[in-house]
Amino acid sequence: MSVYVITGASKGIGFGFVKSISEDPANLVVGLVRDKAATEKKVAEELGGRTNIHILHGDLTSYESLKQAAADTAKIVGERGVDYLVANGAYPSQFDAYVPIGALGDQVEELEEVSAKLFKTNVVGNIHLFNLFIPLVKQSKAKKVIAISSGHGDLDWINNNDIEISSLYGASKAALNVVVAKFSVQYKPEGVLFFSLSPGAVEVGHYDNVSPEQVQGLMGFMGKIQAYAPHFKGAVPVEDAVRTIRATWERASIETGYAGAFVSQHGNKQWL
């Protein structure tokens, strides 16, 4: 039996993790979400109210909510601790998702606001999360912390494939990767594995309501994707992504070189 804490558990990959992991009644899953009532309702309706799922309020932009979530989690898991802390929650900015960074220059206020929100949520929020939950992780058997990152934070991928879009979001994920590496350096001697993982392209509805102008931006990006990964057929269903990601984090270890690493869903640098 393993204990999992998953942030951003209300939808997308986060809810996919909750659904998949809780299928084994021996596992215990704690999901951190901003809207506790709505997520509890979703769990009851879609997962039959599985008793091995606990939903807690936890907002990456609120230190106090994360502190309370850690305290509540400690009461739930007891001496077992947290085997897997999955830092999945994030702010996926749309502001920079379709255009090059230079095209944002005239939108000064929004650029500053979005950048601040990205850093507070995707970077500082996870620093707080790790600091607050590390005592529980150290109590466990598995001792694994997985940060869900993005290929947009990989410098080689950006430079080698001329990836222009998602500049601010990518910068926040690159910063998260550095944070994870720093935590790894600190806690590796105590047997805690920290690493970052990009889930690849997953069908979670990010592009359901794009405008014609945004489609134009995506077309250029998709052309580069086809050149980078000719085998790529499009975003995969959440269920498939979760299966691949879980297989990677299960085999990941300090001994096999994952400590502080930034890898794809496959455990390498092939992002798609």
Swiss-Prot record:
Keyword NADP attributed: yes
Top enzyme class, one word, equals: oxidoreductase
Q: In the UniProt record, does the keyword Oxidoreductase occur?
A: yes
User: What's in the keyword line of the UniProt record?
Assistant: NADP, Oxidoreductase
Which residues catalyse the reaction? S150, Y169, K173
* Induction cue: Expression is co-regulated with the other genes from the iso-A82775C biosynthesis cluster and probably controlled by the cluster-specific transcription factors iacI and iacK.
Report a single Gene Ontology molecular function: oxidoreductase activity, acting on the CH-OH group of donors, NAD or NADP as acceptor
Biotech exploitation of the protein? Iso-A82775C is a precursor for the biosynthesis of the anticancer natural products chloropestolides A to E via a Diesls-Alder reaction with maldoxin. In the absence of the prenyltransferase iacE, siccayne accumulates instead of iso-A82775C and can also be condensed with maldoxin to produce chloropestolides H to K, which show also antibacterial and anticancer properties.
Pathway given for this chain reads:
Secondary metabolite biosynthesis
Q: What broad taxonomic lineage does this protein's source fall under? A: Eukaryota, Fungi, Dikarya, Ascomycota, Pezizomycotina
What family does the database annotate?
Belongs to the short-chain dehydrogenases/reductases (SDR) family.
What this protein is reported to do is described as: Short-chain dehydrogenase/reductase; part of the gene cluster that mediates the biosynthesis of iso-A82775C, a enylepoxycyclohexane and biosynthetic precursor of the chloropestolide anticancer natural products. Within the cluster, the prenyltransferase iacE prenylates siccayne to generate pestalodiol E, using dimethylallyl diphosphate (DMAPP) as cosubstrate. The probable oxidoreductase iacF is then involved in the epoxidation of pestalodiol F to pestalodiol F, which is further converted to pestalofone A by the short-chain dehydrogenase/reductase iacG.
Q: Where does NADP(+) bind?
A: I13, D59, N88, Y169, K173, V202
Instruction: Give the enzyme's EC designation.
Output: 1.1.1.-
Q: Tell me the protein's name.
A: Short-chain dehydrogenase/reductase iacC
Q: Which PROSITE patterns match?
A: ADH_SHORT
Question: Could you say what a knockout of this gene produces?
Answer: Abolishes the production of iso-A82775C, but accumulates pestalofone A.
